[in-house]
């Protein structure tokens, strides 16, 4: 089974990054939780993945996946986005160099670039997902 290696950088502080290895069969919901955890944030807000990387035009993305798409039964208005619970990593990232913008917390707007940097074969001795590398100190999620 193939694993995907990602480099995730804070959008406005690119020197802070995490490398994560995860199965391509994992959902975007699962991946979002791993990204947030790698930065020591609480996984307690809505989020989305967007193909428009510019930072301020992400809602104009051709491809977008949001938690809101999975909350229709809770009275959330459709945003035109696809499901994060039903979409797999392998459905979104196909080639090394593919990037998406990850937005966590629509109030505080934590933005990350998520780039596929490689593929590996599963190692039975490793538990996945795995944080492969941490560079830089993660900022505090809340300035209390």
Enumerate the predicted regions with their spans.
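Short linear regulatory motifs enriched in tryptophan with gly/pro/ser
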Residues: 1-144
């Amino acid at each position: 089974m193939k694993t995907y290696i990602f480099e995730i950088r804070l959008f406005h502080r690119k020197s802070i990054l995490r490398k994560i290895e995860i199965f391509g069969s994992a959902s975007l919901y699962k991946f979002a939780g791993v990204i947030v955890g790698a930065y020591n944030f609480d996984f307690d807000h809505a989020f989305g993945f967007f193909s428009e990387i510019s930072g301020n035009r992400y809602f104009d993305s051709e491809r977008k996946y949001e938690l809101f798409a999975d909350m229709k039964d809770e009275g959330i208005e459709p945003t035109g986005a696809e499901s994060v619970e039903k979409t797999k990593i392998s459905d979104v990232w196909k080639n090394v160099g593919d990037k998406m913008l990850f937005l966590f917390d629509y109030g505080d707007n934590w933005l990350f670039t998520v780039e596929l940097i490689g593929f590996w074969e599963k190692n039975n001795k490793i538990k996945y997902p795995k944080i492969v590398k941490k560079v830089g100190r993660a900022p505090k999620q809340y300035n209390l």
